[in-house]
């Protein structure tokens, strides 16, 4: 059987002599390519193809239109326009967005890497924070491996009224806060050359109730091995506090982070690392105002109770070592 080739040329291009080496042949609605065996070969391309020749270039065109791609593109464009209204509505309503995320059976993203220093104010609802030598990650609470293994933390009441009550009644439960007070005692020993005593330092620290709230929430959240350090805040005035974590890894549950941020309004809480030691830096945020409606307590009574406590010598030595370690630490701003 002899096939007569059908070729398409530009209008101003002269006809070329027949050459079947790289020429597409059209037979009915199917496109063929010539071969020595004269067996039709169906081309998979439906686009314009350029044929290289020794003479002027020529373009061979398929006779089958690209209807399937056109229909698929229209369907995808229609689907995008339908879902765009839904996602625009979700973006304007954070509660609806949170409800949608909680409704997912399998989370889309379980962990997100972060860099230190990291401001806890950048977290969103249900974000937990994991710090270790393997990296620093934000996780979706309840789905990260650590949350799954440890479960929900046993948090007592940490609303504003409960925190103020614990702050006022710390005189009756002073032994429970001996780790908090031991840091003030160790700081006064370091400041003896400046004729400072523990009572003025205690009064200055307790004048910022949010520092006590922070320690109380961390302790009630199960982190009873933490240590706290107090340093003068030269920028915002008063004191800033470092929460020092023991061990080489830290996991902050999302509920714990939410309670800390709610209790310490007007303070900036930043996660950082210093010489393989993880910590939280708690300092005043000049851009926000702190809560001022907190009853005052008798500092002298607390100091008398503190003097009656028998502090562990190893605890005081540990605090002296930690203060010497963090003397060169520059707090993040």
UniProtKB/Swiss-Prot annotation:
- Which key words are in the record? Host membrane, Host nucleus, Membrane, Metal-binding, Phosphoprotein, Zinc, Zinc-finger
Q: Please verify whether the record's keywords include NADP.
A: no
Where exactly are the transmembrane stretches of this chain?
A: none
Zinc fingers (CCCH-type) at which residues?
128-251
Stated family: Belongs to the herpesviridae NEC1 protein family.
UniProt xrefs under InterPro entries: Herpes_UL31
Region annotated Disordered sits at 45-64
Lineage, broadest ranks: Viruses, Duplodnaviria, Heunggongvirae, Peploviricota, Herviviricetes
Q: What is this protein called?
A: Nuclear egress protein 1
- Could you state what the record's PTM comment says about this protein? Phosphorylated at serine residues in the N-terminus. This phosphorylation regulates the localization within the inner nuclear membrane.
One Pfam family this chain carries?
Answer: Herpes_UL31
- Oligomeric and partner information: Forms a heterohexameric complex with NEC2. Interacts with capsid vertex specific component 2/CVC2; this interaction directs the capsid to the host inner nuclear membrane to initiate budding.
What does this protein do, in the record's words? Plays an essential role in virion nuclear egress, the first step of virion release from infected cell. Within the host nucleus, NEC1 interacts with the newly formed capsid through the vertexes and directs it to the inner nuclear membrane by associating with NEC2. Induces the budding of the capsid at the inner nuclear membrane as well as its envelopment into the perinuclear space.
Q: Which organism is it from?
A: Varicella-zoster virus (strain Dumas) (HHV-3)
Q: Where in the cell is it found?
A: Host nucleus inner membrane
